Amino acid sequence: MANSLRSEVIKLYKNLLYLGREYPKGADYFRRRLKAAFLKNKDETDPEKIKQLIARGEFVIKELEALYFLRKYRAMKKRYYSDDKP
């Protein structure tokens, strides 16, 4: 069981690292924060706590995806609609 949790954590880290490439404050900022967050919990051994942390990481993934989607939507809206009000 611990081995499957380990692989889930590694998969989560890689996924977050990939998503962090487009982070508004920069990829280096995101990478440092991500590494610090994972190192803070590296000694956790309780499987239930690890599952909670994985769930939190998946929530962060969803938030990042929403952030990127909204950023792209706003850029597209600026291109096609003027802010001039009659």
From Swiss-Prot:
CDD domains: Complex1_LYR_ETFRF1_LYRM5. It comes from the Eukaryota. Keywords: Mitochondrion. It is found in: Mitochondrion. One of its GO terms (biological process) is negative regulation of oxidative phosphorylation. One of its GO terms (cellular component) is mitochondrion. InterPro entries: Complex1_LYR_dom, Complex1_LYR_ETFRF1_LYRM5, ETFRF1. PANTHER family: ELECTRON TRANSFER FLAVOPROTEIN REGULATORY FACTOR 1 (PTHR21024:SF0), GROWTH HORMONE-INDUCIBLE SOLUBLE PROTEIN-RELATED (PTHR21024). Belongs to the complex I LYR family. Acts as a regulator of the electron transfer flavoprotein by promoting the removal of flavin from the ETF holoenzyme (composed of ETFA and ETFB). This is Electron transfer flavoprotein regulatory factor 1. It comes from Taeniopygia guttata.
